[in-house]
Amino acid sequence: MYINPYGADPVTLVADLANSRPRTTRELVDRCREAGVTIDRDADENDLAEVHDFLDGWLVVVDTTDPRPRAEALNSLLAEHAGPPRLTDHDGHWHVHYRADDVTFARLLTAMFSVGTALHLTERGIDRLARCAAHNCTQIFADTTRNGRKTYCSPRCNNRSAVRRHRARA
């Protein structure tokens, strides 16, 4: 079975990149490759700068918790970074792309990130993208849990918060 590459993996990757922005083009490419992105084109400093600019806009989506303004912010990213859907079989099986084949590395990523975020929020819930609820943590996470009740970026933050609540009661 073929899995849609615009789903949970891109929104998880873009959250990771937003939490710890890549400092070099090489780091961006390596982190994308480690996340399973097929790298079939060169990347340069312009791509890194464009991804950083996209992340600034994506953070507006993250930090907007009211559903309608959140959707409007994401729609702006989609309009700027994603193209009309089209079928392609460039890698041996038919699937949908939301971009032209000849786009830059950054445009490949930003299309994948904007569409992936849209699919994540429509399939799992408009509220399933947030910042960690732990004290002094601002990490972003995409809630991919079954019940949709994730409030911490990691088990470590969850445990620290539980200890903090316990000590506050003592």
Segments the model singles out, each with a brief description of its role:
Residues 143, 159, 163:
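Short, non-ligating residues that shape and space the ligands of small metal-coordination modules
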Residues 165-170:
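Contiguous alpha-helical segments
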Residues 1-143:
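Short helix-coil boundary/hinge micro-motifs
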Residues 148-158:
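Cysteine-rich micro-motifs
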